[in-house]
Amino acid sequence: MQLNVGDSVGQINKASSGEWKLYEDKINKITITKKYGRRYFTKSVFYPLDADDVDNNTKDMEESIGRGYILTKEIFGLNEKTRPYAEKWIKWANENKDKAVGLI
């Protein structure tokens, strides 16, 4: 799954407050070079991103739905499947801090 300019990417991380949070930004540029390959650029939140990594993380995130795990600390595409899954997990994790552990 390749993302396009205007699509959103996100990352689940713990904030300094100890709360889990979804950090997100929109892709505003996509480049392809011999040196770096295909990369996604966002306006402010994330540095240039390896597009293949983000695409693979998006696929992994979609496949994790209903399987008892979620990607944390990895950037993935936010779509109609991954966004609600991430938001639901973050709500659960912040209500169950003793059970929510970022493993992947």
Q: Residue locations for each model-derived region?
A:
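Short coil-to-beta transition motif at edge beta-strands of beta-rich domains
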Residues: M1-K21
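Positively charged, low-complexity intrinsically disordered regions
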Residues: L3, I12, R39-Y40, G68, ...
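Hydrophobic beta-strand residues in large extracellular and virion-surface proteins
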Residues: L3-V9, I30-I32, Y40-T42, I75
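Functionally constrained cores in energy, signaling, and assembly domains
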Residues: S8, K29, K35-Y36, T82, ...
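Residues in flexible loops and secondary-structure boundaries
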Residues: S17, Y40, L78-N79
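Glycine-rich, flexible loop segments associated with nucleotide phosphate handling
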Residues: L22-K29, E63-Y69
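Basic/aromatic-rich interaction segments and small domains that mediate binding to polyanionic partners
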Residues: Y23-T58
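Intrinsically disordered, low-complexity, charged/polar segments
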Residues: V45-I104
